[in-house]
Regions:
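Absolute protein N-terminus
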Residues: 1-2, 102
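N-terminal first-folded block
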Residues: 2-40
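Solvent-exposed alpha-helical segments within well-ordered globular domains of core cellular machineries
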Residues: 8, 28-32, 50-54, 93, ...
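C-terminal structural segments of small proteins and small subunits
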Residues: 8, 70-102
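Structural motif
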Residues: 17, 36-37, 62-64, 81-84
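Short, ordered loop/turn segments at secondary-structure junctions
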Residues: 24, 43-44, 68-71, 89
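N-terminal positively charged helical leader segments and presequences
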Residues: 31-53, 60-62
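Mid-chain, well-packed structural core segment of small domains
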Residues: 50-81
Length: 102
């Protein structure tokens, strides 16, 4: 139930253009300080997963592993996506509170 609420909110954030998708773009946004929250697919490759988690830890950006690449892509209206960065503080805080509930 909570996971569905997360995906619904992700869809709204994507339509508001507050979501960056794709591994390299997410890493770039984390480095630039624009990413407020990062969502990572649980079926991401070890290399991609480690790279994104290390960047988030270093730059002190909260991240969560949720769903698979098809769930993340479907929630944002795109094809499969391994990583998503939320650039809006309001969406990020709401998603974070939902993800920390479960």
């Amino acid at each position: 139930m909570i996971q569905q609420a997360v995906f619904n909110l992700l869809g709204i954030a994507a339509r508001a253009r507050k979501v960056i998708s794709g591994e390299e773009l997410v890493v770039k946004e984390v480095r630039n300080g624009n990413a407020k929250l990062v969502l990572l697919a649980n079926d991401a490759s070890k290399n991609s997963s480690k790279k994104i988690q290390d960047k988030c830890t270093y730059y002190n950006v909260e991240y969560h592993v949720i769903g698979d690449r098809y769930d993340l892509g479907h929630a944002t209206g795109k094809e499969a996506r391994v990583a998503l960065a939320i650039t809006d503080k309001g969406f990020a805080s709401k998603l974070s509170s939902l993800l920390n509930e479960k």
